[in-house]
Structure formats: structure tokens, C-alpha cells
Amino acid sequence: MATTNNKNLTITEKVYVRVRLANEADISHIYKLFYQIHEYHNYTHLYKATESSLCDLLFKANPNPLFYGPSVLLLEVSPTPFENTKKDEKFKPVLKTFDLRATVEDKEAEEFKSKSCGDEKEDVFIAGYAFFYANYSCFYDKAGIYFESLYFRESYRKLGMGSLLFGTVASIAANNGFASVEGIVAVWNKKSYDFYVNMGVEIFDEFRYGKLVGDALQKYADKEKA
């Protein structure tokens, strides 16, 4: 059951979910979701992307085979079933129904209304994303998947959807011959830490994450090219 009022969405009892591969029509939503995760971590001052630069990164300038270049899966929700979902030629969408223990109040529904349903449904809204790409390590003889980030808008957290989205990425890795799924886990976020452990992720405490960026990186630039 669902109601809409002043661009807000209220869902009770059941919510229908679809995980699909993002495309160029989704770029404005991806940009907003990426900004929101920077807000969550208090890193908005580091967010340099634009819709145009993201579109180039994810689609126009991405010549890599499927899932080897920067890839985004979107998790969409609807108060009504996805009955006539068209199959993406690259990736078969994953469908699931969630029984709600509490009412979902989405005050951003209109802003995140899906523009790329492919099945003429008007009541589809983007709830979250997974961003990942291939990585390589001398520990393995084939590529792995680097899981860059998983994010849900506040209205759709703690509903079990994270397990579906991360599990879909893990399934992609297992079914396409990747060696691993790897990423960074924030040790300060116990809920996130416990989530990944419960999903089967092994945490290596003896390693620390390092980054060379900004002015520190530019010190290595070829001065003759300046």
C-alpha cells in the first residue's frame, strides 16, 4: 500500500525492489547519490565531480568490458510489483519483495523518481547504489572487483536491502570469474563493519589504507611538462 502527498511517498506492508545496471539516463540521480555519501562522511569539500564528468567516467569514456570499468548498480523501489520488467541486454535485473516492519516515509521521492524504468512504470524510485570496478593484485592470477561504495538514502536503511545489493555484486564476481571482492571498511562504523563481516567479508587489521593525492601527488609531476 502506498500514498503520495506533496511529493512525498509513504509505503506500508510491502515494497517491491529491483536491482539494475545504471545507464546514462540515470546520471543526475547518481550525481546526487554520490554527493549524499560525501555528506554522510563530511567530505563534501572533496567532491569535485560534475554530472558531465561522471557521465564520461561511467559511460562515454568507459571502453572496458562489462564490470571491468567503473560500474554502478541501482536499487529501485516501488509500491507495486515489477511485472513486465524488460531484460537489460548486459545484466538481468534482480527482483525481490520486502515485507516492511515499519512504514517507509520518503520525502525525496519526487527528486529520485526513476527516469529509466524501461517498463512504463510511473511509481519507481531510486533508493541506493553500489559502485565498483575491476582491480588487480599480484596475489591472484586474474582480476578481482574493488567495491568502492554502497549507499542508501535514509528512508531505505535498515530494511535488509544492503544485503541484496552487496550480494548482487558478489554474485557478479562469482559468476564472471573474478578472484575476489575487496574494499575499505570504516572501523568507526560498527554497523557497517558488522554488516560486511556478516556477509562473509574477511577483515585484515594488519593493513592500513594509504593515499597519494593532491599536492603530494603533484610533487611527482614532470616539471618539463609544466
UniProtKB/Swiss-Prot annotation:
What catalytic reaction does the record list? tyramine + (E)-feruloyl-CoA = N-[(E)-feruloyl]tyramine + CoA + H(+)
Enzyme Commission number(s) from the entry: 2.3.1.110
Q: Which SUPFAM superfamilies match?
A: Acyl-CoA N-acyltransferases (Nat) (SSF55729)
Q: What subcellular locations does the record give?
A: Cytoplasm
Task: Quote the cellular component terms of the Gene Ontology held in the record.
Answer: cytoplasm
Activity-regulation annotation: Inhibited by (2-hydroxyphenyl)amino sulfinyl acetic acid 1,1-dimethylethyl ester, by DEPC and by N-ethylmaleimide.
Q: Does the keyword Acyltransferase apply?
A: yes
- The main location is cytoplasm
- Per UniProt, the enzyme's principal EC class comes to transferase
Question: Organism's domain of life?
Answer: Eukaryota
Q: Where is the N-acetyltransferase domain?
A: 72-222
| Any one Pfam family match given in the protein's UniProt record, by short name | Acetyltransf_1
Gene Ontology molecular-function annotations: tyramine N-feruloyltransferase activity
Gene3D superfamilies to which the protein is assigned, alphabetical: 3.40.630.30
Say if the entry is tagged with keyword Cytoplasm. yes
Stored PROSITE patterns: GNAT
State what this protein does. Answer: Synthesizes amides which are involved in stress response in the cell wall. Catalyzes the synthesis of hydroxycinnamic acid amides from hydroxycinnamoyl-CoA thioesters and various hydroxyphenylethylamines such as 4-coumaroyl-CoA and sinapoyl-CoA.
What PANTHER family would the database entry show?
A: DIAMINE N-ACETYLTRANSFERASE, TYRAMINE N-FERULOYLTRANSFERASE 4_11
Provide the family line. Answer: Belongs to the acetyltransferase family.
Q: How does it assemble?
A: Homodimer.
Q: What is this protein called?
A: Tyramine N-feruloyltransferase 4/11
Q: Which organism is it from?
A: Nicotiana tabacum (Common tobacco)
Supply the source organism's classification. Answer: Eukaryota, Viridiplantae, Streptophyta, Embryophyta, Tracheophyta
Q: Which gene encodes it?
A: THT4
